[in-house]
Amino acid sequence: MDEKDLATQQAQAGQDPRLPGPDEDQERAEGAEAQAAEGAPPPHRVIPPHPGLRQDGGPGKPPRPSLRWDGGPGKAFPKPADGATYAKEAAEKGMTPPQLGAGQAGGPGKPPHPGPDRDGGSKASRASSPKKAGGKGLVSLKGDRAFQRLKKGRSGRGRLVLVRWLPRQEGVAVGIVVSKKVGKAVVRNKVRRRIREILRRLHLPPADLLVIAQPEAKDAGFAELARDLFLALKKSGLVQ
């Protein structure tokens, strides 16, 4: 072995194995140049958020609805317009607005439709109607003179009630007499309420009417009392 070969072997033995050799450096340089020529690798695709939606799902995931309407964070849903504003905007856009319900404005220049109150009638008709006592179309017969006059009226008797009546111009004025012979206050009130309810369901002509409950009425049911009262009214000639 000559001195030249010995020097070459010593140089190779003393080289650090962690350092790249000249061939590796050349390959890396060529790879970097090729990559630069081809361009940078494409990035991950991100789905753009839809207007009015907030992107929370991350790359490649569908957007998640936001609780806030479009225009950016911090803008709440638009407030609904009232009937008049909606009708005006619809007319400007050539749209036919839906029929407005009771109590809503009928559009520009139109008065609002009166809405029903809790008992089913309008407030205007309720204010103009006369005050009723008890059942529908019935008013209370008041004053001793009115009761005294009915002694001369036409009468009809049943097993449970006695009726007397006189004609009047309009409406039905009713007096109901339930004595202590019928029972205690609770029983008397029950009989009185039943008689008034029966009269409310009948279509009576205008009259001053007196109904006197008999002691047997305390044990009668509603249907039995209704039949007996109708029979007494028929006997008196008030109903046919």
From Swiss-Prot:
The keyword RNA-binding applies. It catalyses: Endonucleolytic cleavage of RNA, removing 5'-extranucleotides from tRNA precursor. Residues 40-51 have a biased composition (Pro residues). SUPFAM superfamilies: Ribosomal protein S5 domain 2-like. One of its GO terms (molecular function) is 3'-tRNA processing endoribonuclease activity. One of its GO terms (biological process) is tRNA 5'-leader removal. Keywords: Endonuclease, Hydrolase, Nuclease, RNA-binding, tRNA processing. Residues 47-123 are annotated as: Insert. It is an enzyme of class 3 (hydrolase). Residues 1-140 are annotated as: Disordered. InterPro entries: Ribosomal_Su5_D2-typ_SF, Ribsml_uS5_D2-typ_fold_subgr, RNase_P, RNase_P_CS. The keyword Nuclease applies. RNaseP catalyzes the removal of the 5'-leader sequence from pre-tRNA to produce the mature 5'-terminus. It can also cleave other RNA substrates such as 4.5S RNA. The protein component plays an auxiliary but essential role in vivo by binding to the 5'-leader sequence and broadening the substrate specificity of the ribozyme. The open reading frame (ORF) for this protein entirely encompasses the ORF for the 50S ribosomal protein L34 (rpmH). The two start codons are separated by four nucleotides. This is Ribonuclease P protein component. It comes from Thermus filiformis. The lineage of its organism: Bacteria, Thermotogati, Deinococcota, Deinococci, Thermales.
